[in-house]
Swiss-Prot record:
Belongs to the class-II fumarase/aspartase family. Aspartase subfamily. It comes from Pseudomonas canavaninivorans. The keyword Ligase does not apply. Homotetramer. It comes from the Bacteria. PROSITE patterns: FUMARATE_LYASES. Pfam families: FumaraseC_C (PF10415), Lyase_1 (PF00206). Its EC number is 4.3.1.1. This is Aspartate ammonia-lyase. L-aspartate binds at residues 105, 144-146, 191, 324, 329. One of its GO terms (cellular component) is cytosol.
Amino acid sequence: MSSAASFRTEKDLLGVLEVPAQAYYGIQTLRAINNFRLSGVPISHYPKLVVGLAMVKQAAADANRELGQLSEAKHAAISEACARLIRGDFHEEFVVDMIQGGAGTSTNMNANEVIANIALEAMGHQKGEYQYLHPNNDVNMAQSTNDAYPTAIRLGLLLGHDALLASLDSLIQAFAAKGEEFSHVLKMGRTQLQDAVPMTLGQEFRAFATTLSEDLARLKTLAPELLTEVNLGGTAIGTGINADPRYQALAVQRLATISGQPLVPAADLIEATSDMGAFVLFSGMLKRTAVKLSKICNDLRLLSSGPRTGINEINLPARQPGSSIMPGKVNPVIPEAVNQVAFQIIGNDLALTMAAEGGQLQLNVMEPLIAFKIFDSIRLLQRAMDMLREHCIVGITANEARCRELVEHSIGLVTALNPYIGYENATRIARVALESGRGVLELVREEGLLDDAMLDDILRPENMIAPRLVPLKA
C-alpha cells in the first residue's frame, strides 16, 4: 500500500486531517488521540463500557427508526455495527484515553465514528464516506454526549455487576469453608495486639465471611437502586432539545430490552444530567469492601508472621521466593497485593468524589474521570478477590499445636479461669506468670486451685468460645 493509500482525508469544523485508512475511528477521535495522552488507558480497556455505548446507539437507532427519522437501510447498517460491537468485535478501535476534556464528547464521537464506518462498509461504501451515513447526523441522532455517555456508563456498570458479585460470593464461600475446617482449633483472640480471650480459628475465619456477606447484600441492592435511572433522551442539558417528544420513552424502553436491565427514565432529566451522586455512593460501597478486604489481609499477614519469631498460627501458601538476599524467606505476597489494591480503590474514590464535586451548573464535565475511576475500582476489586481466593485462602492451613501452645501460655487464659478461682487469685496468678514467664495453667496446677479434670473441662473449645453458665459457689 502506498503512503497516500495508507490514509484517508476527513474534515471537521477545525480543518482537515489524514486518518489511517484501516482505522474505523475518524477525525474527531484522531484529534482526541493527539490531545489526550494522559493515563495511557483507552476506552477499550473496559469492554463493558464499549458494549454499553453500542447498546445506547442501538436503542437510539431503533427509536429513531420507529419514529420515521432514520431510514430502514441506515437503521439496518447501524444495527449490524452495534451488534458486532456487542459481540466483542472492533473494541480495539476505541482508542481515546479515559481521561479527557469535553465531558466525554471524545468517547461519544469515538463510538459514533466507529459505528458509522462499520455501517458504511456493511452498506457497500468506504470508510469516511459520510455522505451515505454520518456519525453525527445518523448514529448520534437525537442524542448528546451529555445523555448518551452517562447512560452508557451506568449500563456498563450494570452489565459487569454480576461478575463482581460472583467473585465476592466465591471469596465469602472460601472463608466460610475455612471457618468450618478450623472450627476445632482453639487459639487466643487479641485486642490492641495484646492477648485477650480464647476463640477458635474457625470463628475468626467465619467473621471474615460474615463481614463480606454484609457487603454482598448491599451491593446486590445498591446497583439496581442507583444505576437503573438513565437520562437518555434529555440530550444536552435535560430539556430534550432536538429529540422527538416520543423519543425518550421509546429509546429507554428499547435499551432496557436490548440490555436486559430494568432501566427507567430519570424522574428529573435536568438533575440527572448534572448530578453524579449515584456514582459517589456506588464508589463508596466499593471502597467499603476494599477497606474490609485490606483489614482481613492485615490479619492474615499478622497471623502467618514468623515462622519462628512471629505469631505463626496459620500458614499461607508459598507463592514465590521472598528475598534476593535472604535465603529461604517467603513473603505474604498475595495479601500484600490486596492491600495495595485497596489503597488504589480508596484513592480512586477520593478522585471520583472530587470530580463529582467539580461539576458546574447543568453539566459535570469531569465525568470521564468518574467513569475511569469507577471502572478501574471494579476491575481491581474483582481481580483482587479472585487472586486472594485462588492463591491464598483455599490453601491456608492451621498450625494447631502452635495455636494451643499460645493459648496455654497466654496470660489472657486467666480470664476464662476467673469465675472458678476468683478475681484475687486470677490477678495474682496473672502477675506471677508475667513476672516469672511461667504459664497460667502451670501455676494453677502448682497451687492446686483447680484439678486437671476441671481444667480440661474449662479448656474444651466449646466451653471457651461461647457464653457458659458457671455453677454458683456456696
